[in-house]
Every structure is written in C-alpha cells, then in structure tokens.
C-alpha cells in the first residue's frame, strides 16, 4: 500500500482508505482499457474505478472498506462503508464543516464536543441495544451505517444506501438440493479464503474450538497444506471451559505451529482498562479482552494479519438473541429518571419470517 492521502493526478481525486479490495487485480485489468496505471496499489484502482463508474463502483468492490474520496475540481467529498460495516467510519458536523475518522477519539481531537449520549447509554443498560446503525454513544457523533455512502459539499449533506442486504438475500437463487447448497457454500468459502490469504504480509490464524474456525482451518489446510502458518489460541487454565484440547487435536493433523496465549485475572483487568480507552464505546464482553491479548501477541511476533471465523457465526445464525436475556437485575440498579430515557429501537422487518428479522437485525 502507498502513503495516504493518495492523490491521483490523472483523475484529480484524493483518497483515504481503510481496508482491502480483494478483487483489485480483476478490476485493474478491466480499468486498463480506459486508464494507464502508474502504481500497483489498491488506492489507484479505487480512484480510477470511482472516476469511471461513480457511486456504482461500490457494487463492483469485493472487500471490506471505509473510503473517503475528495474531488478537487468539483469540491465534493464522497464517503462509503462496506456492505457489512466491518470497517468503521464516524463523522460529525460542526459550523458547516464535516469531520470524519475511523475512530471517535480522532473527532474529539479535532475539536468536536465530547458529550456522552444519555439516551443511548440508557438504551444500552436497559435493553442491551447499541441503537440504530447510525447512532453512537456520543451526542452529535454518527457512524455511517454499513452499506451506505455519503456526498458532501459546501451546501449539502446527502446520505444514501448503496447496498440492501434483504434484497440481496431475497434475490439469491435457492439451491435445488442439499448437495448443490453444500457445493455452492464450499465454493464461496474457498474463494473467500483465497482472497484473504493473498497478502503481502505474514498471515496467521485465530483458532477456537468452535465449528466456524475449525471449519476454516480445515479448509485452509486443504488449500495450503505446507504453508508456514502460525496458529493462535487463548486459554484461561480452566479445563471445563478451555478449548485448548480441541485446538491441539485439530492441529495434530497439520504442520502448523500453535501459539498459546494465556489469560489470567490480572491480564483481564489490564486489558479491560486498555480496551475501554481504545473502543470509545461498549465492547462485546470477555471475548473482546481475550482477542485483544491474542492480537497484541501476534503483532509482537510479526504476524500482521489473522484469519478467523468472523462472519460464519452470522451465516450459521449461532448467536443468542440478546433481547431474550433478563434485564431486571440491571434495571433495578438504575435511577427511574435515567431509565425513562431508554428507548428500544424499532428495527426494520424486511423478511416475512420473524426469525430471519431477528437473525439479521444488525445487518440492516
């Protein structure tokens, strides 16, 4: 990757980007019919794709990204976030100016007022909800929702949805048999693995005892049996809950090296304080602390990219629904006037099946 902001003299466009466009090689070949490329960077592909196709370039991008493109001639800013919001993108308006960043604290550093949202915190503590896709836990600070883009100039701000998850799901052709469904799923999984492992930096694997990461490890081993992968897994020393025995059994069938990352009560407390400072908003419990420790260990050892089962839990719908949890204990600890600020978001119901609406609630 090149230094950012990235400027393309041919198109007059400037880019800042966080993420990866997995099919950038294919897009480069297609765009070479119309442009001369001066580098081998993804950034140049993104800018020339936007110059050629405008907003519709997003439909051609296969990847995870948060991008901002400034057109010097038109004096307009275009921002977009990937289909499922893997990469964060926050923004705020102040005195007619638009501020944006991949972390909320960067907006505060730029002078945006730092004021917690009482309504959002009340909703979180009473209903265990993070609110609507555009909300944050800070007043007048917003996130661009997954699958949305934004146009901004000196006189207007226009936010639009470019990817509609429910329509994409409903347009998928249903396989005629279990065999066909299995073959199609494996084909898509293999394509995803090949794209993600095509990196110019050291790649490792984050392994738990779950079905998702175990499946991915098996798939990676089938595709790349002799690559020098380093596998990371965390444990706490509790034989009744640790998954380390399963990970060791899995890896006994491979040539991959296992790096075990231990968690102790002292480490958990230290990570909790650190992650609270980093995240700017509530995080998803103990697993976030464990992964933070695991990621920092991998980074110290020179492993820059870690593959894991992120996304497969959603595909297989194996998460519990937080709305089913008993909130009575928490509510009894809150003042009545604070609880009155809480509101349960009215989420969309695009599917006929209510189970589907609950399963994919965070994706639209």
Predicted regions and their residues:
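Cysteine-centered catalytic environments shared across enzyme families
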Residues: 1-280, 291
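Glycine-rich active-site loop/lid subdomains used to bind and stabilize high-energy intermediates
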Residues: 94-95, 154, 248-364
């Amino acid at each position: 990757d090149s230094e950012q902001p990235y400027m393309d003299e041919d198109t007059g466009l400037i880019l800042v980007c966080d993420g990866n466009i997995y099919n950038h090689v294919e897009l480069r070949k297609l765009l070479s019919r119309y442009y001369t490329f001066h580098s081998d960077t993804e950034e140049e592909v993104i800018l020339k794709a936007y110059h050629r196709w405008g907003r519709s370039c997003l439909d051609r991008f296969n990847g995870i990204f948060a991008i901002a493109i400034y057109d010097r001639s038109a004096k307009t800013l275009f921002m977009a976030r990937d289909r499922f919001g893997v990469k964060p993108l926050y923004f705020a308006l102040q005195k007619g100016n638009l501020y944006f960043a991949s972390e909320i604290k960067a907006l505060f550093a730029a002078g945006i007022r730092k004021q917690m949202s009482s309504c959002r915190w009340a909703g979180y503590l009473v209903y265990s909800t993070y609110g609507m896709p555009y909300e944050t836990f800070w007043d007048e600070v917003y996130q661009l929702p997954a699958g949305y883009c934004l146009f901004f100039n000196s006189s207007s701000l226009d936010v639009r949805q470019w990817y509609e998850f429910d329509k994409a799901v409903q347009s998928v052709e249903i396989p005629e048999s279990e065999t066909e469904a299995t073959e199609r799923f494996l084909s898509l999984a293999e394509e995803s693995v090949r794209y993600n492992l095509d990196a110019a930096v050291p790649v490792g694997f984050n392994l738990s005892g779950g079905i998702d990461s175990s499946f991915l490890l098996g798939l990676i081993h089938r595709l790349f049996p002799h690559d020098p992968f380093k596998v990371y897994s965390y444990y706490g020393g509790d034989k009744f809950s640790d998954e380390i025995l399963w990970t060791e059994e899995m890896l006994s069938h491979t040539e991959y090296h296992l790096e075990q990352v231990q968690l102790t009560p002292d480490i958990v407390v230290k990570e909790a304080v650190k992650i609270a400072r980093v995240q700017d908003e509530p995080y998803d419990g103990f697993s976030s602390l464990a992964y933070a420790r695991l990621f920092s260990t991998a980074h110290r050892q020179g492993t820059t990219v870690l593959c894991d089962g992120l996304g497969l839990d959603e595909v297989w719908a194996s998460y519990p629904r937080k709305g089913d949890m008993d909130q009575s204990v928490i509510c009894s600890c809150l003042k009545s006037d604070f609880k009155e600020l809480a509101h349960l978001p009215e989420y969309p119901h695009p599917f006929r099946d209510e189970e589907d609406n609950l399963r994919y609630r965070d994706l639209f």
